[in-house]
């Protein structure tokens, strides 16, 4: 087939006509460029189909005509991985926010309360944002996400107790992070026929990544040192300083 192509930033577009008689095609992007998202739209269809291609792997055969046959399990596993990798390893701002929740206290109850509030909140706005019920530009959402990191780090310096307002604040920040997740999933693309399955899988992937972040942090620090008298001074406070400074940097960067 003859194609015209254009590249802008990290988006590469190709369009054209396929050679008659070819039932399907595959796509592969060089492994040196890392993982990529392939979005396919046919001229006779408004709906776009997305494929997650990890580290240069070749796509499955994509029919030239008609919708591709994809099982529920295929779609679920694809968006589960996308949700997980959006946090680990690519979502450093979300990782630092979750670490801020973890570093508040060595007790399990405050952590569970915060993580539950955050999870419920981002699940709500992820769905509503993807449905188009709520829409805020990234120029507003992204700076506010950075501000949430600064706030969590600053409050953790002041107390190691779960204040009465903390769950509500975390819930509010979770709503913002959910809009960020929705923006990412919207860019990736989600076919209408796969909407519910893909949305649930992506959200579960995000939650599993959050659990992984907390588990890694606990195994690296909490398991060994949380009962030490110097735990907050030598581990928590330096970590909060890094988290707060990173959040402040992103806040300025995203505003400018």
Predicted regions: what they are:
Residues 68-90:
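Cytosolic-side membrane-insertion boundary helix
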Residues 38-74:
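Extended, hydrophilic extramembrane loops/domains of integral membrane proteins
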Residues 20-37:
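Short, surface-exposed ligand- or partner-binding patches at beta-edge/loop junctions that are enriched
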Residues 86-256:
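Hydrophobic alpha-helical transmembrane segments in multi-pass membrane proteins
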Residues 14-19:
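Short, hydrophobic beta-strand segments
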Residues 1-12:
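Single conserved hydrophobic/aromatic residue that forms the stacking wall/gate
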